């Protein structure tokens, strides 16, 4: 899921999210393209090779030639199944979308309806093939377990699922929900080894470390997979009694929100999570910043490009003294696509 691991010239491809704002019928075309699964990870990876072909195109030439090259490259490299009718449709749509003709369509008055239309995912693409930011905005968590299942027709945007919030608030931290499947293991990318803690369903212990997980499970006579992760890392997950555990794609920490102003920069108020967070930052050599972005196991780590993108999103929301979980999540729930569109433009070109 290294969606943001793209070269800088590919940034404009993200602008498809704002296309329906002013181009009328193009909105249906974009939705259709998404529905057909045109924007899969392999396709965007294939776009890296287009610079060579762009240089060879004469002025005013149709984009179909390079789009065809991208699809053929994608098919060759990633083994995509060729469907002639669908490929022809994608050629037509992509020649329009990636021609640069509509890249200025994102405007300040873009409505949540327009944004929802751009990301309405009635498609055959799997959850894992979608960009993490897009998936969390569109409520990738709907109260049920995800098993890489296809998006369904009733996912219409930010406020279409009653009772479901894009984020969960805890300790002034915004956590973007991905799914609620239970697994006892943490990926070393997002938490230093030895800091994981598990909750034993047999004896009720909440401080079982990763090093003691196997022996503890043996002592209690249960499978090690029965251990549930318990408030591990800097609020990447949290256990609510009587409710399924929830896991998150990434956590955004606002060091300047009211609950953090009396603590060290980029640390949380909770002593336990502060200690873990400091160790995480030191181990990953993350530079101090107002917003700290931590990846969860579902992402397998966050590249610097991804980190800059999310920080750009948070900064565009003008979160001065407001709690990030209140302000940023409210912006997402209200479908303020302008914030995201502005953050997307040039996000990967920002200096490290």
Give names to the regions the model predicted:
Residues 1-352:
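Nucleic-acid-interacting cores, centered on viral/eukaryotic replication and modification enzymes
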């Amino acid at each position: 899921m290294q969606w943001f691991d793209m070269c800088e010239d590919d940034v404009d491809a993200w602008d498809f999210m704002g296309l329906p704002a002013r181009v009328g019928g193009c909105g249906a075309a974009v939705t259709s393209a998404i529905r057909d699964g045109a924007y899969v990870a392999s396709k965007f990876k294939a776009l890296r090779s287009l610079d060579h072909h762009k240089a060879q195109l004469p002025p005013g030439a149709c984009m179909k030639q390079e789009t065809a090259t991208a699809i053929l490259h994608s098919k060759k490299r990633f083994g995509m199944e060729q469907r002639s009718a669908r490929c022809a449709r994608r050629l037509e749509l992509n020649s329009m979308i990636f021609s640069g003709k509509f890249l200025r369509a994102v405007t300040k008055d873009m409505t949540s309806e327009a944004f929802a239309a751009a990301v309405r995912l009635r498609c055959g693409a799997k959850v894992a093939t979608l960009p993490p930011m897009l998936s969390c905005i569109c409520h990738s968590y709907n109260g049920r377990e995800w098993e890489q299942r296809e998006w369904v027709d009733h996912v219409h945007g930010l406020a279409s699922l009653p009772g479901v919030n894009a984020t969960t608030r805890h300790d002034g931290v915004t956590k973007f929900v991905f799914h609620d499947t239970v697994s006892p293991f943490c990926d070393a990318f997002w938490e230093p080894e030895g800091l994981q803690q598990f909750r034993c369903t047999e004896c009720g212990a909440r401080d079982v470390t990763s090093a003691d997980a196997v022996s503890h499970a043996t002592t209690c006579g249960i499978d090690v997979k029965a251990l549930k992760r318990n408030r591990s890392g800097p609020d990447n997950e949290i256990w609510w009694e009587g409710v399924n555990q929830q896991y998150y794609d990434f956590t955004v920490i606002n060091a300047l929100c009211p609950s953090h102003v009396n603590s060290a920069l980029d640390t949380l108020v909770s002593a336990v999570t502060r200690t873990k967070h400091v160790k995480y930052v030191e181990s990953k050599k993350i530079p101090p910043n107002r917003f700290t972005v931590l990846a969860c196991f579902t992402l397998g780590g966050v590249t610097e490009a991804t980190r800059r993108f999310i920080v750009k999103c948070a900064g565009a929301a003008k979160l001065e003294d407001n709690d990030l979980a209140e302000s940023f999540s409210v912006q997402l729930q209200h479908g303020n696509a302008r914030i995201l569109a502005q953050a997307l433009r040039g996000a990967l070109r920002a200096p490290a």
